[in-house]
Regions:
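N-terminal Rossmann NAD(P)H-binding glycine-rich loop of SDR-like oxidoreductase domains
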Residues: 3-25
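SDR active-site strand-loop-helix element
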Residues: 6, 30, 73, 107-112
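Rossmann-fold NAD(P)-dependent oxidoreductase module
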Residues: 15-19, 98, 132
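Conserved glycine-rich Rossmann-like NAD(P)H-binding loop of the short-chain dehydrogenase/reductase
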Residues: 25-32
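NAD(P)H-binding glycine-rich loop region in Rossmannoid oxidoreductase-like domains
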Residues: 35-102, 114-116
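A short helix->loop->beta-strand "cap" motif at the edges of active sites that frequently abuts
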Residues: 101-106, 137-138
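Conserved beta-loop-beta element that borders a ligand/cofactor-binding pocket
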Residues: 111, 131-140
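Conserved catalytic-site region of short-chain dehydrogenase/reductase
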Residues: 113-124
Length: 140
């Protein structure tokens, strides 16, 4: 299976990537800076690295069209301007629009546990991302 892995320098993706490769999947990882991603531990035949910034639509065409599944592990809490919720929504929208132009059938999104009454700014943002991603032409 051809898998797209976003948020590849994050904790969860770092744990997930070796498992995906060990299972025999072809994995394309999205990173903002290729220099920050160490590929030496992996078989180059099953791993490709592309530089993509989901806030910059001009970079999204680097994502291959022939992917079967994608992991959305992007999280923008580190914004120095404090507008991480808008950044997260824009990233999710750009991701969704690009995925709609691929053959992806399944997107896996890791959210947070939310209730409908009282949400922190962080969890409200995660819920908005889920709502944005759920509008895609794939299973979420």
């Amino acid at each position: 299976m051809k898998i797209l892995l976003t948020g590849a320098t994050g904790y969860i993706a770092k744990k997930l990537l070796p498992v995906l490769i060990a299972e025999g999947h072809e994995v394309t990882v999205c990173v903002r800076d290729r220099k920050r991603f160490d590929t030496t531990r992996f078989n180059a035949a099953t791993l490709s690295v592309i530089e993509v910034n989901f806030l910059d639509r001009s970079t999204l065409e680097r994502i291959p069209e022939d992917i079967d599944a994608a992991y959305y592990l992007i999280h923008s809490m580190s914004s120095s301007t404090g507008d991480f919720d808008e950044m997260e929504k824009a990233s999710a929208m750009n991701f969704r629009e690009r995925m709609n132009r691929t053959r992806v059938r399944q997107v896996i999104y890791l959210s947070g546990i939310v209730n409908t009454r009282l949400l922190s700014k962080h969890l409200a943002s995660r819920k908005r991302v889920e709502e944005e991603l759920s509008q895609g032409s794939y299973h979420l």
